[in-house]
């Protein structure tokens, strides 16, 4: 139980910032788009925009960042020490029917958050990012 409290206390200062980032990140329609796919945007412009959002966030926070052709963004605390690799994706599946609100607008209902990508995989990606930010040396 003490470890849980330790990590909750470590994350608490970032909660408001993370929610703002999640809202902005979710708002990016990053469904694979064959029509906007080209050499600079291998998965379409929306996916590239989502990857660039993460890239810019990490650069702003002082991380070493490499964007490999809008396919992979690597975030490092340094380039010398061994690193832990966390893999996540910034694209989302196409929007289906039945959404009671805009699927790219973060909606809070009670203790739950709803939007395309909250659980797969934009929310977890940002959780890992803010964990890295909180724990970095």
Where are these regions (language model features)?
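Acidic/His- and Gly-rich active-site-bordering loop/insert found
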Residues: 2-118, 135-137
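Active-site alpha-helical elements of protease catalytic centers
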Residues: 117-132
